[in-house]
């Protein structure tokens, strides 16, 4: 592994008050981020930090497509599979952990490489987080109870009336984010998106946002093959084991794509073929939303998904000051 000195000296941690220099590698699900990340880490002397909100869960390494044991052995990886299914993690809490991890990596003379597909994580990391006042837990409980009563579709429609911009960014079944946006609007009188535009904290990190440009026609057959490989290699057994650890359908870990469909199969709400079809449709829709989100980021640097050399080169010439 080459020394970082060819890129301006050994990586050094920034003072606590300064944004930490990092490289961000993003893209839609199934676009080949893991392979590209390993190539960048090997070429530049990096360590990988997970930036995918589903890959934080310990019970679902296969279903959430976490790096394999062989891939994990190629270089140090951080923030993968550390959270129980019953727990949730906010973007702000993740960013704090990612920042602390990046600081440790820099202190070792290595480059922090953030890898994933969760746009909100990258937004929080590179642009800060909205400093929203605390919401009364009773208000949260009231909206949660109402969601149970009328369903997520109706609540999503309500969100579309008070915060149409945010409603277009989240899935109508994303119960946690729907409740969060509605409670913030009710508590503050301002839409969730207003807070993210006008009350942002200091960004914890700084660096390029490299995005794999994987169009849907290219992605679709890859997503289908990956799903079939997951199912053939024991995805349902993994879900069944997770159910023994957390028998709560509303637990945060069960809300992700793949986890929710597998749970529906295990509960007898879907047959196997219907489960696979829904899983694939939802994965495709998610990839489309990811592409839409990243295309709206003016700082994104788009790169071919099937050319890791191009990704390595782009990362090398865009290293932020301090690494």
Swiss-Prot record:
Site residues, Interaction with substrate tRNA: 118
UniProt cross-references to Pfam families, sorted A to Z: IPPT
EC top class, as a word: transferase
Binding site for ATP: 27-34
Binding positions for substrate per the UniProt entry: 29-34
E.C. designation(s): 2.5.1.75
Keywords: ATP-binding, Magnesium, Nucleotide-binding, Transferase, tRNA processing
Intrachain disulfide bonds: none
Cofactor section: Mg(2+)
Single GO MF annotation: ATP binding
InterPro entries linked: Dimethylallyltransferase, IPT, P-loop_NTPase
Gene Ontology biological process terms, A to Z: tRNA modification
Keyword tRNA processing attributed: yes
Residue numbers spanned by region Interaction with substrate tRNA: 52-55, 176-180
Record's catalysed reaction(s): adenosine(37) in tRNA + dimethylallyl diphosphate = N(6)-dimethylallyladenosine(37) in tRNA + diphosphate
Record-linked HAMAP family: IPP_trans
Family to which the UniProt record says this protein belongs: Belongs to the IPP transferase family.
Record text on subunit structure and interactions: Monomer.
Purpose: Catalyzes the transfer of a dimethylallyl group onto the adenine at position 37 in tRNAs that read codons beginning with uridine, leading to the formation of N6-(dimethylallyl)adenosine (i(6)A).
NCBIfam families on file: miaA (TIGR00174)
Protein name: tRNA dimethylallyltransferase
The organism's taxonomic lineage, starting at the top: Bacteria, Pseudomonadati, Thermodesulfobacteriota, Desulfovibrionia, Desulfovibrionales
């Amino acid at each position: 592994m080459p020394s970082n000195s060819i890129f301006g000296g050994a990586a050094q941690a920034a003072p606590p008050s300064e944004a930490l220099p990092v490289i961000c590698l993003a893209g839609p699900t199934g676009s080949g981020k893991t392979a590209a990340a390993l190539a960048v880490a090997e070429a530049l002397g990096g360590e990988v930090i997970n930036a995918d909100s589903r890959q934080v869960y310990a019970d679902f390494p296969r279903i959430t497509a976490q790096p394999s044991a062989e891939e994990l052995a190629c270089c140090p990886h951080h923030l993968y599979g550390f959270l129980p299914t019953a727990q949730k993690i906010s973007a702000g809490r993740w960013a704090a952990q990612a920042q602390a991890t990046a600081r440790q990596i820099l202190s070792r003379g290595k480059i922090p490489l953030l890898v994933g597909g969760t746009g909100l994580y990258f937004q929080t990391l590179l642009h800060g987080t909205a400093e929203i006042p605390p919401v009364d837990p009773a208000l949260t409980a009231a909206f949660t109870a109402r969601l149970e009563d009328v369903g997520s579709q109706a609540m999503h429609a309500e969100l579309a009336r008070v915060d149409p911009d945010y409603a277009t960014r989240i899935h109508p079944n994303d119960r946690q984010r729907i409740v969060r946006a509605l409670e913030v609007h009710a508590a503050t009188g301002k839409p969730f998106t207003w807070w993210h535009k006008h009350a942002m904290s200091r960004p914890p990190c700084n660096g390029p946002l490299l995005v794999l440009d994987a169009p849907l026609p290219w992605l679709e057959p890859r997503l289908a093959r990956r799903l079939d490989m997951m199912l053939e290699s024991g995805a349902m057994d993994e879900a069944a084991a997770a159910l023994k650890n957390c028998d709560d359908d509303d637990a945060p870990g069960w809300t992700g794509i793949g986890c929710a469909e597998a749970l529906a199969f295990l509960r007898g709400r879907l047959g196997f073929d219907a489960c696979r079809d829904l899983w694939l449709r939802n994965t495709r829709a998610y990839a489309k939303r990811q592409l839409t989100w990243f295309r709206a980021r003016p700082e994104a640097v788009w790169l071919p998904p099937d050319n890791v050399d191009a990704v390595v080169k782009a990362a090398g010439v865009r290293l932020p000051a301090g690494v």
